[in-house]
């Protein structure tokens, strides 16, 4: 692979352009402490309550891993990869064809108020990137918006 001047990668084995995709949700303010928000996101079963209405499957596979599917989309398995108490949770793809991470950034505003933002990052070929950018942006916005009423 070689990095081009514009920051894209070229995979010379496949002659495909690899895009580094970074998407961020809006920040949402919760009437919960940073510790409460962290604890909620640390328990993977809680992600079921954050999912969009068009979810067709949700299953906790292990204490730190879950599977979900949205109608018309393939199943995705996410595994907790990193946790920094009260400030950051990183979920990563666990198997499958796509390698990506979903990071929850938690900031304390006050003792009983916090701010959460989700960030999606991954490397995809240009065609895949164009296809998934819109749905993933909407997906992470839905997850963070649903946090307000989830707990």
Model regions and ranges:
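Beta-strand/loop substructures that line and gate deep hydrophobic ligand-binding cavities in soluble
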Residues: 94-145
